[in-house]
From Swiss-Prot:
Residues 31-58 are annotated as: Disordered. Signal peptide: none annotated. The keyword Transport does not apply. Residues 145-364 form the Radical SAM core domain. CDD domains: Radical_SAM (cd01335). It is found in: Mitochondrion. Its cofactor is [4Fe-4S] cluster. Its EC number is 2.8.1.8. One of its GO terms (molecular function) is lipoate synthase activity. Its main location: mitochondrion. This is Lipoyl synthase, mitochondrial. It comes from Ostreococcus lucimarinus (strain CCE9901).
Amino acid sequence: MRAVLELTRRRARNARFARARAVVGARARAADAQELRDDSKGGSSVDKATSTAAEARETAHTLEGFREALRHGPGFDDFVRGDVAYSVPAPKSLKDKTTRKPAWLKREVPGGERYTEIKSKLRELKLATVCEEAKCPNLGECWGGGDGKTATATIMIMGDTCTRGCRFCAVKTAKAPPPLDKDEPANVSKAIAAWGLDYVVLTSVDRDDIEDQGAGHFRETVQRLKASCDVLVEALTPDFRGEKHLVELVATSGLDVFAHNVETVPELQRDVRDRRANWDQSIEVLKHAKKSGAKITKTSIMLGLGETHEQVVNALKLLREADVDVVTFGQYMRPTKKHLAVVEYVTPEAFKRYQEIAEEMGFLYVASGAMVRSSYKAGEFFLANVIKQRKAKEAAAAN
């Protein structure tokens, strides 16, 4: 008799628990249906306020459902005895959400003869590119050399493993990466000479594990390039922990453009970058490079990380005060779910407005668009013309 009563109680508890789960499921499905309706009306452009309100309602429903399940569901003893098999898949609306990309961010899958040729040569010479390591969305366009333009690739020297861990970056990290490849400067110059490029971007990982943080290696690579072929060189450098003699070592190597990225507005530096990097340090790097003789300095800012319009405008003012010549704006794209989430996808109209503001401030060149990156062939084409014109004027003045 006691066993029959116990069995009846268990069945009653299980029935109540099933009803509670049904309530949670029904509410989740209703939230999913609402989300689909929103998407059909232009959900990808729903503003932050609407999105936040929907998430708040969903959270309230979820908490209420869980409380009901706890009140009426099986007890701990039921789970211990194995009377209840509890395995319920998470409703779609409760899973980790990824902000949906708008249409203007779509790109074709990379391919083509030129793309294959560059990739093959890189593998042969054991060279890395930031295009691949950072999962750049423009890889196919730049390597493929579309629209009759020269194909470009940004070579990443000093290995493919960084000693820092910025929260936006997909490059591998380690406290002590493999040693530098002494043959790399020669291999880089060999590859560039074979491609016949007239503008090349060199960038690197951070190497805090090396005494000079790789500044000497960077300098040698630039000098070998300049000696082996007629090429304009842009160096996109680390901050070298703000050590000015190391910045100067690279700035006086013979490069044509000294680039160092501030990445985001001052207010978001601690959230976005490695703790060893900061706005003031990066500004000092750019200032000292110009003082050391770099004729053109350049930086880049990612948008979509939660920055405000006022913060972006203020950042531009500070960059002009530091005598920075070139600035680029691009949309932050989350490499994996382990990285910072995208707060918003900035519209093409907003990118255009930032470009206008920067140009009014007197920057030599501004590239602003969702798919623009610090190393992007449209900007390189413009800078190549600027540099050639300056050299022609200098030669004419000398005569």
